[in-house]
Every structure is written in C-alpha cells, then in structure tokens.
Amino acid sequence: MYEYAIYPFDYMRITQSHNDGNHVPHWKNVTNYSDKPWDEASKDSGRQYFIPQNDYVVEQVLIDSRSVRLRTKNNVLIPYKNEPVTLYITLTHMKLETMKRLYVGQLIKKNEKIILEGDEGGAYGNHFHCTANIGTYYGLKYNNNKKWVFCYEKSLLPNEAFYIDPDFTHIMNPKGYDFKEVPIGYRKGDSGTDIEKICNFLSNFVKGNYYGDYCEACVSVYKKQHGIVGDGTTIDSQTLEAMKKDGLKL
C-alpha cells in the first residue's frame, strides 16, 4: 500500500504564496526556466524544524544559496495525480550550521529533526523558501525574469504536492491554498488495524478484483453506490458516517 505525501511542517503559516510579490517572476511570463515557490514560516518568528512525515533522501546540498534538494525515499501519492511518484522538494534560507549537517545520500527519516529554518540567503525573517516538483531536474537556473529557480519537469503548488494530516499539522494560514486531508486510516494516529477493518467492511459491498490500491478502489465504488461526491478515494467525514451507519466499527 503506497504512502501519502504529507505536509512536512507541524504548523502551517504560509507567509508568501507563489503568486505574491517577488515570487511571481519565478513563473509568470517566463520563457525558459521556472518554479512556483512558497514561504513557510511555521509557528512563529522563531526557528522551527522541517519535520518530514515521509522518509527523504538528500539529493544536493548548495552551501552558497543555503539550499537543499530532497526526494522522497519511496514513491508517494500526491493530490496532483492518482499514481505513485517520486516527489522532489527544495528548502532554502537555512543557516550554515544546518547546512553542515547535510550531505548527499543522507536519509532523513520520518519525524527526524535535522533541517532548521533560518534567515540567510536574502531572507527577511526566519522561514523556509520551498518548492515541490516531479519529473526530471534541469538545474538551478537563471530565468528571463532575472530569478534563480529550481527547474524541474513539473513544478507543483503546495496543495498539489501534499496532503494535510489534521492530527499533525495545525493550520494557521494556508494563504488561500485548498489542501486535501489525507484519507482516514493513513493519519498520524491511525493504525494498520483500521485499514484492515475498513477493507474487510468494504468487501461486503464491492465484489471483484481491482488494479492499484484495493482499499482506495473499493472506497471509490462505495461512494458512487451511496451518491457521495468529491474525491473518489478519500474517506471524508460524510463517507465515514455512511460506513458507520452500514455497520463499520473502528
């Protein structure tokens, strides 16, 4: 069963979106290289950690720009597409003390606190300058709008790259981004037993074999049977309530 890409900060306080201020020239009216960054300042003006909810591997450490490129160790499910992909993210503005702890090939495990936000590399106040991406990496490029960008095959908005686990991330300011919650059974407090119970329950309503994630496929069929609209693979509150009425016990 594939894992979901979870937003890697315990507090969401996005202070600048991709379409605000000096982030706009990163992508608008660009004829060559682009990315779509956002700034995550976390809980307060102090220094907070990047707290991964998936395992990541360090791809590149760029001391001069105070940046690091990471990729998920495993393929993950992201809101942008319904198939597992390798997700690439970049973080910028860390202090030198943090940069010296990082090296290529380093495994950063789930919940491991290594990367601490900072205010270096042209930053105003402590925060992470972030990008999320999929596909081929073409390099740190200087675009026709005179901005340095992390150029990948496809740059994603934060809500296209990550799901939210409401038991982990406290949302203070999503800056207009509409995030999806990770399905029930995959959250921080959920156990594998819940997944097994849900799959066994759904097998009473759905017959036959399905490709991909069996539980997700069954959820989609169940929701259609019950006239529930929305993301076909997500066990939202309405779906969970319907399941409980049909006899699901967690």
Q: What are these model-predicted stretches?
A:
Residues 187-191, 207-217, 231-240:
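A glycine-rich, coil/turn loop motif that links secondary-structure elements
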Residues 1-79, 109-110, 119, 123, ...:
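Surface-exposed, glycine-biased beta-strand/turn segments
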Residues 221-250:
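Extracellular LysM carbohydrate-binding repeats and other cell-envelope/extracellular binding modules
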Residues 1-13, 41-48, 100-103, 109, ...:
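Acidic, glycine-rich catalytic/binding loops that coordinate metals and/or anionic ligands
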Residues 111-114, 216-223:
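Conserved hydrophobic/aromatic packing and binding residues within compact polymer-binding modules
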Residues 98-125:
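Beta-rich strand-turn-strand
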